[in-house]
Curated annotation (Swiss-Prot):
Phylogenetic lineage: Archaea, Methanobacteriati, Methanobacteriota, Methanomada group, Methanococci
Enzyme superclass (EC): lyase
Protein's pathway: Pyrimidine metabolism; UMP biosynthesis via de novo pathway; UMP from orotate: step 2/2
Keywords, sorted A to Z: Decarboxylase, Lyase, Pyrimidine biosynthesis
Protein name as catalogued: Orotidine 5'-phosphate decarboxylase
Length: 217
């Protein structure tokens, strides 16, 4: 890892080509702490892409599947995913039983379970924002490992973080979505993550862009 920083950098790698994904992951691995992949890459390439990225980078890989189903289905998705990945992201709005089903799998496999409270896009203010504090309370009660809260609205990030005190935060929205890194760093603390995706992987030189963000942290 390049230098020392209290706040960690998570690369959101939402490309759909296997070779490109592995190359970018490997090139940026010196400057990132964790790599987050989602449905675009896994649906295009299969679950084995997780193992390939881990092997190429020696970094943890978190699957951002935002799992949101009934408990029995959530359990199956978590089982399949966590046979490969180091962690999985689920939605909180489906309720405590559905989240607990994933938590049980995570605990059995010693893997991270991260729950969405409020997303970073404008549409999240229409519905999710109204129940984000309640979901943060649920995250605190269930003792999830981490929560998702938005970099695009630092005041919301701060409020949600103050509720789920024991969970680490992963915060999307810096870069292409317009979130300000300095504002976010004023809120986040040790063991929290800033998530940056397109600003790095769409750049002509992803390695240099990852380094640039790391040096600002």
């Amino acid at each position: 890892m390049y230098g020392e920083s209290l706040v960690k950098l998570m690369l959101a790698l939402d490309v759909m080509d296997e070779k490109k994904a592995v190359l970018i992951a490997k090139e940026t691995s010196e400057y990132v702490d964790s790599i987050k992949i989602g449905y675009p890459l896994v649906l295009a390439t299969g679950l084995n892409i997780i193992d390939k990225i881990k092997e190429a980078t020696n970094k943890e890989v978190i699957c951002d599947f935002k799992v949101a189903d009934i408990p029995s289905t959530n359990e199956k998705i978590a089982e399949l995913t966590l046979n490969h990945a180091d962690g999985i992201i689920c939605q909180g709005f489906v309720g405590s039983d559905s989240v607990s089903a994933i938590l049980n799998v995570g605990k059995a496999k010693n893997k991270k379970v991260i729950m969405v409270t409020e997303m970073s896009h404008p549409g999240a203010t229409e519905y999710l924002q109204n129940v984000a504090e309640d979901m943060a309370k649920m995250a605190d009660r269930l003792k999830v490992d981490g929560i998702v809260a938005p970099s695009t609205r630092p005041e919301r990030l701060e409020e949600i973080k103050s509720i789920a005190k024991d969970a680490f935060v992963i915060s999307p929205g810096v870069g292409a979505q317009g979130g300000n890194l300095s504002d976010v760093l004023n809120v986040l603390s040790e063991n929290d993550y800033v998530i940056i995706g397109r600003a790095i992987y769409e750049n002509e030189n992803p390695k240099e862009m990852a380094k640039k963000y790391r040096m600002q942290m």
